[in-house]
Amino acid sequence: MASIAEMQKPHAICIPYPAQGHINPMMQFAKLLHFKGFHISFVNNHYNHKRLQRSRGLSALEGLPDFHFYSIPDGLPPSNAEATQSIPGLCESIPKHSLEPFCDLIATLNGSDVPPVSCIISDGVMSFTLQAAERFGLPEVLFWTPSACGFLAYTHYRDLVDKEYIPLKDTNDLTNGYLETSLDWIPGMKNIRLKDFPSFIRTTDINDIMLNYFLIETEAIPKGVAIILNTFDALEKDSITPVLALNPQIYTIGPLHMMQQYVDHDERLKHIGSNLWKEDVSCINWLDTKKPNSVVYVNFGSITVMTKEQLIEFGWGLANSKKDFLWITRPDIVGGNEAMIPAEFIEETKERGMVTSWCSQEEVLKHPSIGVFLTHSGWNSTIESISNGVPMICWPFFAEQQTNCRYCCVEWEIGLEIDTDVKREEVEAQVREMMDGSKGKMMKNKALEWKKKAEEAVSIGGSSYLNFEKLVTDVLLRK
């Protein structure tokens, strides 16, 4: 039986969108709340709950007496694949099938031997949970996991529809220069082009699942008692200010992986992780044998898929650069096929390259051997790179990765973009420039400046540190 002191704890139920890039920051935030004395209920879908057990072992989800894991259905058919589920499929299914199980879980928790649920922390694109918050009379904070610039861009989807920029007239608009159209009317986004908007605008169908999903999700922004963003003011102030009109309670509390310094001493939390793929820890030992700033780190994240031809072009570009590299390539990265890297590539690069399927990216990016990050420009990857002072070569795939790429290359001056139609010569040239060239040196220095500002944001008295304190006291613990 729980003690009186235990039963009086605030109880946060945390529910991420069921993809790796959303689960990680939600887990980091949940650990911070736990450090502040909250009882935590962390809710995955059934599919990812099972994947966590497979990747981290059955004990990974045992949690703690005050940090529990639960799962609810998402309405999709069962699958044993080691891959991210269909994003459109999830977006269509979750709002229809997850609300009642989520409400049932809250009711069960409220009737059990744990403190009653006192607040909901929901992913910003899981706004169906607001109906549960209303039903149980609970405050709900919406955690939007993209960058602030990506978040701002999503909030203008409705304007793009109303002004008839989208949907596209026909598929020729994807290649005829139309996406270069400059939009000078969006506050906080100077010189932004259609191509820099999150990719779900690239449709000719007004009923497109993803376009409509974000139109609906952004309409829910004012309904959260607060919005949290995994960024810091010095980096994205210009993108945050315009969104305050939609919800004045916006808290920038990132980089969240750096905020973990306040909970790292808690041994009880060490076994609680969120990687859905089994990590290869040997890559750190390999990096230990390399000189500072000598290794190209390549990782296109948990969702990106590419053609076999693109995979081969990236491979030979890396090989021809003659630089050491660590390449993380998921088995499912080539759409519908097992990722097969040519044997002759492996032979050519065996002395200077390591290829593996997954790693602890935070550990890799803070390793002194890493000189540049070849990335898909997902936000977790981007902010982890920024906060470790590592410049980037950007190959955005979908969602707000296009926006992040634009800001890295133009606003923050820490990145070069590779064309979607990737060619080995361009990969080789950009790797050499970033590792040896004058532009690369300038971007490295700029990245180190941003690293310093990120460290200041999360230090005691820094902007993100204070915002987290205010969020807890003024929102989550407010009676």
UniProtKB/Swiss-Prot annotation:
UDP-alpha-D-glucose binds at residues 302, 358-359, 376-384, 398-401. Its EC number is 2.4.1.-. Coiled coil: none annotated. InterPro entries: UDP_glucos_trans, UDP_glycos_trans_CS. Keywords: Glycosyltransferase, Transferase. The keyword Glycosyltransferase applies. It is an enzyme of class 2 (transferase). One of its GO terms (molecular function) is quercetin 3-O-glucosyltransferase activity. The keyword Lipid metabolism does not apply. May glycosylate diterpenes or flavonols in leaves. Belongs to the UDP-glycosyltransferase family. This is UDP-glycosyltransferase 85A8. It comes from Stevia rebaudiana. The gene is UGT85A8.
